[in-house]
């Protein structure tokens, strides 16, 4: 009986995928590709874009921060969606 109960608990945890954390890209313009695991409860990745005297700048990470023009932002909700 205990074995059955333990088996049901393990199957429930695996099926519910408890503790899932979103993975987002977090590299900046022209840097090697890197990722980060977002904090618990964070379910969004972002990419921001803006121009400066060197050209287009890009920043990526977890969350969906507010930005002001001329910065543009794209937010998404799946692993590695912000590349």
Curated annotation (Swiss-Prot):
Keywords: Disulfide bond, Secreted, Signal, Toxin. The keyword Secreted applies. Disulfide bonds join 24-45, 38-62, 64-75, 76-81. One of its GO terms (cellular component) is extracellular region. Expressed by the venom gland. Its main location: secreted. GO terms for molecular function: toxin activity. It is found in: Secreted. Residues 1-21 form the signal peptide. Belongs to the three-finger toxin family. Short-chain subfamily. Type I alpha-neurotoxin sub-subfamily. This is Weak toxin DE-1.
């Amino acid at each position: 009986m205990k074995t059955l109960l333990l088996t049901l608990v393990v199957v429930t945890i695996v099926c519910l995928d408890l503790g899932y954390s979103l993975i987002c890209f977090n590299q900046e313009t022209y840097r090697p590709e890197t990722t980060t695991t977002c904090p618990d409860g964070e379910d969004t990745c972002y990419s921001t874009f803006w121009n400066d005297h060197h050209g287009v700048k890009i920043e990526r990470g977890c969350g969906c921060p507010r930005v002001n023009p001329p910065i543009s932002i794209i937010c998404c909700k799946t692993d590695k969606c912000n590349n």
